[in-house]
Every structure is written in structure tokens, then in C-alpha cells.
């Protein structure tokens, strides 16, 4: 029996471009409003079915590029689809420089995910202005009961210090929390270098590389001899994952927290995305063939439902072996503690 017809606005013509998973014609040339109520799950391999699934599950009409939220459906249709602005039931809470933002952008392509288009950093402002749960909810996208609402905040893992209590209070003890953890030495260096580049714009010549190395040694390497956390710098502190995870486990059970291996994501993104889908209770959408590695930038990219590569990160200078060894020696007991708590060996734990 044919699905009942719904009077819905037509999507904008999407010039989807040629793709091995579907045709290159525009969405409106085949759009059938009846698809809003009846779709089969081949949305991960066929661009037509993907658009139909987005239309069925979402409160927005897909636009080009598909990473954008799209245009909101008219009010009458939103009411019939029970569209509401809901508080997040899941959040990607870091860690900075470990790929969490990229993973979140990929997740937003899933038809069953309604996610904010940018980090709101809402919990940084609790206590200032209007930071009530209602104010937070009104910053969320509309979603249907077929979707989960998500937010991302790459600094939340570390700060504010009472972030676990705030998330539990504003959302729920059952909210799903995703942390992306990567090699702490590499994370530390990438974070420090990013800040250095903000203060010293432009390409680095030989003298500048020497200056960077000296500043890094003074700021980070020398601080590894300090055992008081409040005397270490922020870059070093954030890479001591276990101390922050303990605060989160005081408020949430292990069933509510997923630690994603950021280094493994670069090697096998489909596998890590499936772990996230299973954790969130989503249908499996992402496939191995969706991802590829950009040889020019080294970045993990996606080619379905539309090709997207994140901006290239600036490459930091390599550390000398003695410096790497010193940092490895510093982080090893903390990594061992993380292994004990998570009961999960990260691929990067073998780097030192």
C-alpha cells in the first residue's frame, strides 16, 4: 500500500554531483512527499534514499552542502511530525586536538542525528547571562522523535571544573557522553603549536623554529618535573586524561561514557563510527567505503552522501627523540591509570 501523501515543501535543487553511490541529478527532480513516511534503510548507499531518509526523520529540508542544517519545514508540517527543540541526549565533550569536532561533523550527516551547527560552549557561561536549561534548549535544532539531539564542546572534558555536575544537572544522569582521546604527546604538541601560531602568524623560518622549541621546552617539558597540577600549564594538564575522567566518573556510570580512540579513527574511521552509532542506539549508517585519506593533507575525509574534507591542520615541528622520550616517561603512569579505569587499551598507548 502506498504511503499516505503529505503536503510538504519541495527541497531546494541539490546539485549533488556524481558519486559512486548515486546519481548526479537534483533532489527535487525525484522528490516524493510520500517518502516522508515510508523509507527503506539503503540510505547509506543511495543518495536518493539518503535524502528521503533525511526528509522523513528531520524537521529540515536538506540543502547544499549537506553538512548544513538546511531550511526549516513549515510550521504545520513540523507539528504533524512532532518537531520540537529538545535538550541534548548526547554530547561530544572533547578532547581538543583529538578529532572530536571532525567526528561530530560526520555524525551530523546521520539521518537520525540533529546536532548544533557549531560548538555552543554553553557550560563555559553558566552563571552568566541567561544560562538556564530552557535557554540551552532554545539553542538546539528542531528534532523529531526519530532523532537524537546532540551538542559538541571540545573543551568540556577539561573545563569548567564542575562540568560533570553541570551536565548532569542541566541534562540527565543518562545523557550519553563521548570523549575522543588521542596520543597525549601529539595532542600536547599540536595544541601548543596551534596557540603559538595564533600569536606568531605566518610561516616558520629556522630562527622561529628554534624559538618555538625553546618556548615549548620551558612551558611544557620543564613542567613535567612539577607534580602539583596547579603549577603545570594548561596544555600539559589536558593531556593527563585520567585526572579529568575521574571527575566525570564521579557523576556518570561507565555505561554513559564512550572513549573513542582518536588515533584509530584516522586509520579505520568506519570502525570507530560504528562504535559510536551502537553506543548512541543509532542504525548503522557509516560504511568503510564512505571514508578516504587525503594524500595531500593527511586528513580523513568522507565521500558519501557528499564529499567533505576538513581544513588542513598546520603541521608542527617534530620533537627530538630525547624530548619525546621525556614526555613519554611523564605520561606513562597516567596512561596506565587510564587503562585500568577504562579497561580499554588505546592504540596510541603503544607509541611510548
Region spans (language model):
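Generic structural signal for small/hydrophobic residues in well-ordered secondary structure
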Residues: 99-100, 136, 150, 167, ...
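Short glycine/proline-rich turn/loop motifs
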Residues: 80-85, 221-231, 311-322
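PAPS/PAP-binding and catalytic site of the sulfotransferase fold
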Residues: 99-112, 163-172, 191-194, 234-285, ...
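Short, conserved clusters of charged catalytic residues that mark active-site
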Residues: 87-88, 131, 135, 162, ...
Amino acid at each position: 500500500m502506498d504511503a499516505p501523501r503529505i503536503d510538504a515543501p519541495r527541497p531546494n535543487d541539490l546539485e549533488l554531483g556524481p558519486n559512486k553511490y548515486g546519481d548526479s541529478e537534483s533532489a527535487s527532480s525525484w522528490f516524493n512527499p510520500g517518502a516522508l513516511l515510508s523509507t527503506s534503510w539503503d540510505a547509506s548507499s543511495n543518495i536518493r534514499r539518503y535524502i528521503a531518509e533525511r526528509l522523513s526523520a528531520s524537521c529540515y529540508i536538506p540543502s547544499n552542502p549537506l553538512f548544513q542544517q538546511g531550511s526549516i519545514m513549515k510550521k504545520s508540517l513540523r507539528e504533524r511530525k512532532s518537531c520540537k527543540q529538545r535538550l541534548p541526549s548526547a554530547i561530544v565533550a572533547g578532547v581538543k586536538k583529538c578529532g572530536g569536532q571532525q567526528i561530530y561533523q560526520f555524525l551530523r550527516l546521520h539521518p537520525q542525528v540533529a546536532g548544533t551547527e557549531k560548538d555552543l560552549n554553553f557550560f563555559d557561561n553558566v552563571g552568566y547571562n541567561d544560562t538556564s536549561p530552557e535557554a540551552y534548549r532554545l539553542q538546539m535544532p528542531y528534532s523529531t522523535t526519530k532523532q537524537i539531539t546532540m551538542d559538541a564542546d571540545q573543551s568540556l572534558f577539561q573545563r569548567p571544573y564542575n562540568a560533570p555536575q553541570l551536565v548532569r544537572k542541566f541534562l540527565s544522569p543518562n545523557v550519553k557522553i563521548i570523549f575522543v582521546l588521542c596520543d597525549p604527546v601529539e595532542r600536547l604538541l599540536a595544541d601548543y603549536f596551534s596557540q603559538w601560531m595564533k600569536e606568531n602568524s605566518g610561516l616558520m623560518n629556522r630562527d622561529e623554529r628554534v624559538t618555538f622549541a625553546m618556548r615549548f621546552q620551558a612551558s611544557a617539558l620543564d613542567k613535567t618535573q612539577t607534580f602539583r597540577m596547579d603549577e603545570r600549564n594548561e596544555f600539559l594538564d589536558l593531556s593527563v586524561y585520567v585526572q579529568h575522567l575521574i571527575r566525570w566518573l564521579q557523576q556518570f556510570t561507565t555505561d554513559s561514557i564512550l572513549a573513542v580512540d582518536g588515533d584509530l579513527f584516522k586509520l579505520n574511521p568506519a570502525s570507530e563510527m560504528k562504535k559510536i552509532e551502537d553506543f548512541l542506539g543509532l542504525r548503522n549508517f557509516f560504511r568503510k567505503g564512505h571514508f578516504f585519506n587525503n594524500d595531500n593533507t593527511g586528513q580523513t575525509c568522507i565521500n558519501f552522501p557528499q564529499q567533505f574534507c576538513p581544513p588542513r591542520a598546520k603541521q608542527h615541528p617534530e620533537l627530538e627523540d630525547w624530548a619525546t622520550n621525556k614526555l613519554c616517561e611523564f605520561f606513562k603512569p597516567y596512561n596506565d591509570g587510564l587503562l585500568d579505569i577504562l579497561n580499554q587499551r588505546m592504540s596510541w598507548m603503544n607509541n611510548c
